[in-house]
């Protein structure tokens, strides 16, 4: 068993509480936490102070935002789950899409088209919710992931100066697998 404690600042209360439970479970079962725990963080010293050995600390830049973190060391658990070859292919696909969004003309640019459709649906058609209903159990957590991503990225009602936005922000995301959502 390997516990990967992932926290950008290594101060997130809920994450550290869960990590503490894992650490206690390991100790209660005669396993040294330093042999079964790793950390992914932008603050190596805090992970080290918490007891994670240097060789098991995977760093990423402090400027990496949550919505982009999968492509950094935060993707460690994904890489373990799907294998390094598949993870490398996923990174290559993301890179290809990044290049497309940067270089494609607006009329053919999938990122621009999808973004404009979201603005159209939310602001002009007044579609305030978005249902996500995967019909494959392997995607059962996709709605929850999309909710978190949407709220982190677009769920704000004020701008950086704290002033109310002139237009509605992103829609409310909801859903469950298949017929449960209907």
Segment roles from a protein language model:
Residues 18, 25-182:
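Active-site phosphate/pyrophosphate-binding segments
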Residues 1-26:
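Well-ordered mid-protein domain cores that form the structural environment of catalytic cofactors
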């Amino acid at each position: 068993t390997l516990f990967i404690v992932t926290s950008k600042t290594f101060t997130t209360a809920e994450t550290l509480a869960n990590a503490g439970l894992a650490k206690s479970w390991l100790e209660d079962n005669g396993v040294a936490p330093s042999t079964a725990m790793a950390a992914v963080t932008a603050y190596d010293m805090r992970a080290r102070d918490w007891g994670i050995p240097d060789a098991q600390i995977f760093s990423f830049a402090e400027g990496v935002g949550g919505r982009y973190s999968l492509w950094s060391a935060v993707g460690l658990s994904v890489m373990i789950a799907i294998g390094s070859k598949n993870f490398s292919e996923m990174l290559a696909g993301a890179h290809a899409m990044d290049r497309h969004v940067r270089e494609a003309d607006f009329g053919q640019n999938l990122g621009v088209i999808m973004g404009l459709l979201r603005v159209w649906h939310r602001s002009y058609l007044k579609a305030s919710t978005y249902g996500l209903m995967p019909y494959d159990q392997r995607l059962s957590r996709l709605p929850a992931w999309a909710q978190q991503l949407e709220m982190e990225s677009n769920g704000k009602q004020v701008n950086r100066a704290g002033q109310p936005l002139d237009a509605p922000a992103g829609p409310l995301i909801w859903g469950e697998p298949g017929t449960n959502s209907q």
